[in-house]
């Protein structure tokens, strides 16, 4: 299954993927049980020109897994980034999260 780069044209699919997460999964992804409005604000504020997002789509072209590598805006922390990953419940156990993490590490090193 290929990993694709995501851009602002994928914003609606990112929103749908994240809002489909169950409360416990939202807590794991965001560090708190984000509600739909909080997720919408998060997606609206993604800085695609600075950050890097990767996704995996199923055969129906639904986003089933995604990773967000968010780089610090603080000039003193230019080498710092935050990583977030989520995988749709039905797609877990297939190594998608690990593959997205590996891709993010390679990108961050370069």
Residue ranges and their predicted role:
Residues 1-110:
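Long, contiguous binding/interaction regions
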């Amino acid at each position: 299954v290929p990993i694709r780069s995501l851009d602002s044209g994928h914003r609606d699919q990112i929103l749908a993927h994240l809002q489909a997460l169950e409360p416990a999964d939202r807590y794991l992804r965001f560090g708190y049980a984000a509600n739909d409005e909080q997720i919408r604000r998060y997606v609206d504020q993604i800085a695609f020109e600075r950050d890097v997002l990767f996704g995996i789509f199923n055969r129906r072209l639904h986003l089933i897994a995604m990773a967000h590598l968010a780089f610090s805006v603080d000039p003193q922390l230019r080498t710092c980034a935050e990583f977030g990953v989520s995988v749709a419940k039905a797609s877990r156990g297939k190594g998608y999260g690990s593959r997205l993490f590996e891709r993010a590490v390679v990108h961050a090193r370069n």
